[in-house]
Amino acid sequence: EVSGRQADTCWFEATGDVVQGIRDRARYADLVIVGQYEWQGSPETHPLPIGHSVVVRCGRPVLVVPAAVQLGSLANVAVAWDGSREAVRAVHDALPLLRLARSVRVVTNSPESTENGDDDAESLLTHLCRHGVAVDADVLRLGSAPAHHALRKQIEQGPYDLLVMGGYSHPMWMEFVFGGVTESILLSLKIPVLVSH
């Protein structure tokens, strides 16, 4: 359905700092699409992916598309949900795509009830319905495993056409020492990821 619609798109080439060039042009875009960086070296020497750098600097949603993937139907969508500001932003940035989806699954490691007794993930499903996301929607709880491992495993078991998630940023030395969920997902997933910061 999306491929049949007319969309106003633009392509640009830039010299110099790639991330700065994308950031400067992204201010006037609804969505930025970048390719996943194919790193040939060892995992220990992998630089931050361009997609992550663009996400934390441009203020726009970024669709990171793996090199081996052709965009097709976005019928089955997973939403990585932790209730954070970044996750909320990602969901709202993705609403036009979520409305077109046939199936939306909220993937979370949040408990079934918050301090005020609400189920945060179920509340998100209700919110999505109010915004026209009338789909086969449900919640999958990941349990206590590290977030990026559990999320990656669930997405790989699929079948999903798109992952929507918040993009997190920490000081560079923390990312080097501890790694990061956003970087881990962007480096390893084989489906497009829509990320907002």
Where are these regions (language model features)?
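A short helix-to-beta-strand connector/capping loop
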Residues: S3-C10, H131-D136
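Well-ordered alpha-helical segments embedded in enzymatic catalytic cores
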Residues: G21, R89-D93, A150
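Charged docking surfaces used in two-component/phosphorelay signaling
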Residues: W11-Q20, L140-A147
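Gly/Ser-rich helix-loop-strand patches that form or flank binding pockets
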Residues: V19-Q70, Q154-H197
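Short acidic/Ser/Thr-enriched loop-to-helix initiation segments
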Residues: E44-R60, P66-H131
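A structural signal for isolated positions on well-ordered beta-strands in alpha/beta enzyme cores
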Residues: C10-F12, A78, S103-V107, D136, ...
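Glycine/small-residue-rich hydrophobic helix-like segments
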Residues: S103-S169
